[in-house]
Amino acid sequence: MATEFTVPDSAARIATAQQAGGGTPVRSGPPDEGGEFSGDRMSLSMGPSHPSTHGVLRIQMELEGEILTKADPIIGYLHRGDEKIAENMTYNQFVPYTDRLDYLAPLANNMAYVIAVEKLAGLTVPPRCQAIRVITAELARISSHLMGLGAFGLDVGAWTVLVLSLNQREFLYNLFEDLTGARFTTSYTRIGGVTRDVPPGWLENVGTFCDKFLPALEEILSLLTRNKIFLDRTVGVGVISKEDAIAYGITGPNARGSGIATDLRKDRPYSGYEQYEFDVPVGTKGDCYDRYLVRGEEMRQSVRIIRQVIKNFPGGDWYATEAKKVFLPPKGKVLSSMEELIQQFMLVTEGPQMPAGEVYFEAENPKGILGFYIVSKGGGVPYRLKIRSPSFCNLSLVPKLCQGVLISDVVAILGSLDFVMGECDR
């Protein structure tokens, strides 16, 4: 739960700034007939190349002095047409494109997409595969929150937080590389399973990371949690009410920071999450500070989940053996069996054949709820694929959040929302 602190809130600072106004504006609207500027408003474009927009986002702002009267996010600079691309690719071929949605948590994106396809195909993966997916998803959550926390700290002037966060994330990338062969865009999850089983000693390395990470996390959080400057910049700033969070479709840590105790891993468990004990952190004020606290606690809970998975890690297969029509056969069998060779050829060229129908699945990703709606007319490619992006919903609230705040607070608000433009623009 969030802790209350008695510090000046944004409303008090705005009132002080307004009372101190009256000076000559830096720029004041369009020039009049005499060539002079008139009025008291200034137009300012923030981005699309700006360190505090966390990607290619542009905010078109209007200001009166240092107070924002308008802030319109302009998106689309990273639009690639992912949903249309999906209509011209087999279900397996689209997996790498999901890496590039929330590119800070590709393993979590993979899992959400393949579970949607498995739901369409009526497949159930074995417990070992589910356990692997849970571990990778929670490691991805920690990795994403570390980057969000570090960037947020940098935005408000805490450079050391970024350095320490990136240091811990490097250990995670080593684990990802050992498991998947890639550090960033992994493409590890497959329809009906995963690319390969966990290598020898990998689970022990994950456990060692968890043991070392928790003290490191406490050190990182101690730099911010009771830091007077950080409190001044975040407490009472960018408040999202419960009503606004629901109306705008805000999910994930941003919704939980506003007191909405919802988490799909608890409410609608998938991939075996119902087996694990963990808490859902919830804030009380809905401001930037509460969102920071929620993400910090979520990393602790992710470690708690990972330790339970390792302790009860199941044996058996890491892919659905009955899913021959969707899962590529092992390479050894392809080289020795004509039947397996033909199966691989058909899966690569035609794609896994799906029944006609439609399905929607959503997962609890680090940024919020990531959903995939798939319409199939049968065959190896989807007729329509729609992506429900949490970052898109989070950004839709920016005009309301930034109304009447100081321009310096915009940086804190954007950092606390922790969006990623690859997912928003897709």
Swiss-Prot record:
It is a peripheral membrane protein. It is an enzyme of class 7 (translocase). It comes from the Bacteria. PANTHER family: NADH DEHYDROGENASE [UBIQUINONE] IRON-SULFUR PROTEIN 2, MITOCHONDRIAL (PTHR11993:SF10), NADH-UBIQUINONE OXIDOREDUCTASE 49 KDA SUBUNIT (PTHR11993). NDH-1 shuttles electrons from NADH, via FMN and iron-sulfur (Fe-S) centers, to quinones in the respiratory chain. The immediate electron acceptor for the enzyme in this species is believed to be ubiquinone. Couples the redox reaction to proton translocation (for every two electrons transferred, four hydrogen ions are translocated across the cytoplasmic membrane), and thus conserves the redox energy in a proton gradient. Residues 1-51 are annotated as: Disordered. Keywords: Cell inner membrane, Cell membrane, Membrane, NAD, Quinone, Translocase, Transport, Ubiquinone. This is NADH-quinone oxidoreductase subunit D 1. It is found in: Cell inner membrane. NDH-1 is composed of 14 different subunits. Subunits NuoB, C, D, E, F, and G constitute the peripheral sector of the complex. It catalyses: a quinone + NADH + 5 H(+)(in) = a quinol + NAD(+) + 4 H(+)(out). Pfam families: Complex1_49kDa. GO terms for cellular component: plasma membrane. NCBIfam families: NuoD, PRK06075.1. Its EC number is 7.1.1.-. Belongs to the complex I 49 kDa subunit family. GO terms for molecular function: NAD binding; NADH:ubiquinone reductase (non-electrogenic) activity; quinone binding. Coiled coil: none annotated. It comes from Opitutus terrae (strain DSM 11246 / JCM 15787 / PB90-1).
